[in-house]
Curated annotation (Swiss-Prot):
Belongs to the UvrC family. Interacts with UvrB in an incision complex. Keywords: Cytoplasm, DNA damage, DNA excision, DNA repair, Excision nuclease, SOS response. One of its GO terms (cellular component) is cytoplasm. Its main location: cytoplasm. Residues 14-91 form the GIY-YIG domain. PROSITE patterns: GIY_YIG, UVRC. GO terms for molecular function: DNA binding; excinuclease ABC activity. The keyword Transmembrane does not apply. This is UvrABC system protein C. It comes from Malacoplasma penetrans (strain HF-2). The keyword Chloroplast does not apply. The UvrABC repair system catalyzes the recognition and processing of DNA lesions. UvrC both incises the 5' and 3' sides of the lesion. The N-terminal half is responsible for the 3' incision and the C-terminal half is responsible for the 5' incision.
Amino acid sequence: MNEQIKDKLKKIPHKPGCYLWKDKNGIVIYVGKAVDLANRIKQYFLKDRDLKTKKLANEICDVDYVVVNNENESLLLENNLIAKYKPKYNMLLRESNAFPYILVTKEEHPRILYSHDSTKKIKGTYYGPFANSNIKKYELYNFINRIFPLRKCNKLPNKKCIYYDIGQCLGPCIKKVTRQDYEPYLKEINDFFSGKSKSIDEQLEKKEIQAAEKLMFEDSQKYLELRKNLKMFSERQDIIFSQKNDEDIIGFYCKENVISIVIFKYVNGSLLSKYDLITVFYSELDEILLTLIYEYYSKIAIELPKTVYLSLSDEKLKTLSESLKIKFLNPSKGVKKDVMDTAFNNAVEIMKNKYLQLISNQNRELNSLEELQKLLDIKDLYRMEIFDNSNIFNTNKVGAMVVYENGVKNKNEYRKFNIKDEDANSDYDYMKEVIYRRYKNNTASFGEIPNLIIVDGGKPQVKAALESLKFLELDSIIPVIGLAKDDKHKTDRIVKWDFSEIKLDKKSDLYFFLLNIQDEVHRFAISFYRNKKSKSLFENSLYKIKNLGKTRIEKLLEKYETLDKIKEASVEELSQIVPIEVAKEIKKL
């Protein structure tokens, strides 16, 4: 502890508030909150502190703090400070749209939609999120959309559509259809998502048998798979409360400085989904629980429950209730206590399965970042942006950018680039264009300026990046390095911005850390290239179909953003854009 901190510790009040630990460069490395600032801050410098806290404390060179009126205010302030400074030791939740939802819109003529958007921009009833990777969610959605005659068209057409002819729509485009007409189907959909799926299973079984009798074995297998999906989905509704309330039940388990949390989400009394998390923390257990739970309900949860059951002190539960406007309770007995015990057991299992790997990975990542920081003599390495290009014979030229924050990839910040310069014919040209376009207008869509740019390649790629940065007057602000390969095409050295080289120890954690980064950007670039190439080949095939001209192809590609979505679309869906005979030809491709 230096003299500056010793002096500040004498002046810190015994009041609630937030504290900010800073390193030797003045960078905020941790934000915490406390009911008593003075007592909490002094705990970091006790002799019997654990290894994780010791690691954090060894980096501390200064502290700032903000006094507030109560714990509720400190919780809100902590959240804002973490968002502002993004400290490397705050292992908080990041919003994710990875898991899909199925949405029934609240329009006059409702539709069933498949969405990854958790912001609820479209008004309606959201079912999900569906995290089970074994469930073929989109196929299940397609089947549900076909058997319930809700509106399929984005806008009502002026004449009847094929969905009305084949019995998949009530036909509001040609006759009066009221909301009451949809009610039986809406109830049946809700029953399905409540686990009452017997009638749908019977329909699938009937189609499976009919397909087998016609020797259409692929179709028969498809219906069998859908039935299995339906069974897996229904099994998630095993725990049902007699009271049809929207409630969450939280269990957690702590081992040293690692916490695992499980949240059971109940909708209308039925268990709909499970959310789990395991993370390292550097504060008191009550503090990190408050922070993580606040983060979850303020940023990640799409539907807020009326009540949350959690084993915490009355004081902490009151703080959460006031902050989130949700009732937080601690059940002492009964079925809610039993389910909380189940959630606790789940949290214990997560800890058993992931603890060692989490600690090992985190230590390697932090150590590798520190080693790279020292090696390059860079002030901070919070954010790194890594670039690669992909093409074959100068066709379907693409660039890709991946982002790492505190040594962890942030997929929400990944970006793809189509090479626009038709005269560009080398990796040097592609890199130059991509770097220029990334930093020309540092808009919010790209995130903040990185602490380091890494390019996949040696001196030519580093030179290309530096040229674009120099043109933008950023060459003295953002350092650039390249990951270069030897004669055997194996990465073996770092090429710095001054073109000096640093040989890498192929047995070191840093080497494997950089190799993983390089593999990630290469994978991302290659997948983008393959998709673009496949799309190009698919487009060429489309042009060979009779009565399918440029305008119709453009409309197809406008509605179905990816090739997979075109392939998944039924003949009936495609026939909304092209004649039905043309739609059948497309399905043959």
